[in-house]
């Protein structure tokens, strides 16, 4: 789960990480009032969306008067902000963050993220913070340093010093930088985050180190014990189909193709999408119904897939382990009738009660195309949507 920058800064503030003063705004008038309350003389008007690259996309502007704040807020609020992370369709800006202007002398990058390979927390830092960190990672990876923190030990003073030295933090700011790293680590652990990123981390002309941005991702599996984090969720920033799917415990992710996929198991779902692409098709979604799918869940899955106007065909690929094939067959038949299915449907089932499931589909009277292998299923659905 992601949150907005201003929400992330509130969390950092709670853990003692220095951040500039700022006030969220939902209207142009609120933006003006926020600027007046902060007092200026320079403000930053920031679009609040769940994507990076806002500055390059025109979503972060400096204002030097209240009139500037009003004009920029009117320009940014409601715009369709396109960044390298939103895709070409962009994301509508519904919230702003009005923040004190900063004395920027040197920008750094700092983040901590779960590293599953080492089963540790990776601290990543760079002397080249700001809007072009992706380009730094691509062109000059030697400017990015990584250390791994054992969660049983925590971030040590020596590791903090290693980070400071690695990014060339001046001596008069090193102690403050290490303190921020330790507080960031505690924040990361205590909030069950999977990513906390500060980009940029600014050092001003007086040697003060301040977080000018905040990006958080939280482990969805831990949200049950973090109601205060769940309360920060902004459904407007999420795909409506994914939000709807989550209500029925369906793992759904929208893609750009035209072949809907309904599969049980994440691994099989990814393999199914790969196979569709191998045979010249493009999947329209990832959809894992899990091991406890009911006919009702299958019906809802069909409804969600078919809300996407790009879907021209559906492939159902089921391995009957925990999930019984006859249960899926019942769900498929029920779903086809409930949605009055008008697009080609290919079903491949293997495993528990396989023959019974196939028999039910064959006797349903519905134009369901059967397949025995993944390759056959992919070939048939790709041909059917041509």
Swiss-Prot record:
InterPro entries: ATP-grasp (IPR011761), ATP-grasp_succ-CoA_synth-type (IPR013650), ATP_grasp_subdomain_1 (IPR013815), Succ-CoA_synthase_bsu_CS (IPR017866), SUCC_ACL_C (IPR005811), Succ_CoA_ligase-like_bsu (IPR005809), Succinyl-CoA_synth-like (IPR016102)
Coiled-coil ranges from the UniProt annotation: none
Domain annotation ATP-grasp: ranges: 9-244
Cofactor: Mg(2+)
GO molecular function: ATP binding; magnesium ion binding; succinate-CoA ligase (ADP-forming) activity; succinate-CoA ligase (GDP-forming) activity
Pathway the protein contributes to: Carbohydrate metabolism; tricarboxylic acid cycle; succinate from succinyl-CoA (ligase route): step 1/1
Annotated protein name in UniProt: Succinate--CoA ligase [ADP-forming] subunit beta
Catalytic EC class: ligase
One GO cellular component term: cytosol
Cofactor note: Binds 1 Mg(2+) ion per subunit.
Known partners and oligomeric status: Heterotetramer of two alpha and two beta subunits.
Catalytic activity: succinate + ATP + CoA = succinyl-CoA + ADP + phosphate; GTP + succinate + CoA = succinyl-CoA + GDP + phosphate
Species per Swiss-Prot/TrEMBL record: Delftia acidovorans (strain DSM 14801 / SPH-1)
Ligand binding (Mg(2+)): 199, 213
Keyword Repeat appears in the UniProt entry: no
Enzyme Commission (EC) number: 6.2.1.5
GO biological-process terms attached to the record: succinyl-CoA metabolic process; tricarboxylic acid cycle
Signal peptide limits: none
The protein's role, per its UniProt record: Succinyl-CoA synthetase functions in the citric acid cycle (TCA), coupling the hydrolysis of succinyl-CoA to the synthesis of either ATP or GTP and thus represents the only step of substrate-level phosphorylation in the TCA. The beta subunit provides nucleotide specificity of the enzyme and binds the substrate succinate, while the binding sites for coenzyme A and phosphate are found in the alpha subunit.
Record-stated family: Belongs to the succinate/malate CoA ligase beta subunit family.
Organism classification: Bacteria, Pseudomonadati, Pseudomonadota, Betaproteobacteria, Burkholderiales
Binding annotation for substrate: 264, 321-323
Residues reported in the UniProt entry to bind ATP: 46, 53-55, 99, 102, 107
Domain of life: Bacteria
Keywords recorded for this protein, A-Z: ATP-binding, Ligase, Magnesium, Metal-binding, Nucleotide-binding, Tricarboxylic acid cycle
């Amino acid at each position: 789960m992601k949150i907005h920058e201003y929400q992330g800064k509130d969390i950092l503030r709670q853990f003692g990480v220095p951040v500039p003063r700022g006030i969220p705004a939902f209207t142009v008038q609120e933006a003006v009032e926020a600027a007046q309350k902060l007092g200026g003389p320079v403000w930053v008007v920031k679009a609040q969306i769940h994507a990076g690259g806002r500055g390059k996309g025109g979503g972060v502007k400096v204002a030097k008067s209240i009139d500037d704040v009003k004009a920029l807020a009117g320009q940014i609020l409601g715009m369709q902000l396109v960044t390298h992370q939103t895709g070409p369709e962009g994301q509508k800006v519904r919230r702003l963050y009005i923040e004190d202007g900063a004395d920027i002398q040197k920008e750094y990058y700092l983040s901590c993220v779960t590293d599953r390979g080492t089963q540790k927390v990776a601290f990543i830092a760079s002397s080249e913070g700001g809007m072009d960190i992706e380009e730094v990672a691509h062109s000059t990876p030697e400017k990015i340093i990584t250390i791994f923190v054992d969660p049983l030990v925590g971030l040590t003073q020596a590791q903090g010093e290693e980070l400071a030295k690695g990014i060339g933090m001046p001596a008069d700011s090193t102690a403050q930088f290490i303190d921020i790293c330790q507080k960031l680590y505690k924040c990361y652990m205590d909030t069950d985050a999977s990513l906390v990123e500060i980009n940029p981390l600014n050092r001003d002309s007086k040697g003060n180190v301040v977080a000018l941005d905040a990006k958080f991702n939280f482990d969805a599996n831990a949200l049950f014990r973090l109601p205060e984090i769940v309360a920060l969720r902004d459904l407007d920033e999420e795909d409506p189909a994914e939000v709807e799917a989550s209500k029925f415990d369906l793992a759904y992710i929208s893609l750009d193709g035209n072949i809907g996929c309904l599969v049980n198991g994440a691994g099989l779902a990814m393999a199914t999408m790969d196979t569709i692409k191998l045979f010249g098709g493009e999947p329209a979604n990832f959809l894992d119904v899990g091991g406890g799918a009911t006919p009702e869940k299958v019906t809802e899955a069909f409804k969600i897939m078919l809300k996407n106007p790009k879907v021209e065909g559906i492939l159902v690929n089921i391995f009957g382990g925990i999930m019984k094939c006859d249960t899926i067959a019942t769900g498929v038949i029920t779903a086809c009738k409930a949605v009055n299915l008008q697009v080609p449907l290919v079903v491949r089932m293997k495993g528990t009660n396989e023959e019974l499931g196939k028999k039910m589909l064959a006797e349903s009277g519905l134009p369901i195309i059967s397949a025995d292998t993944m390759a056959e299923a992919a070939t048939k659905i790709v041909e059917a949507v041509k």
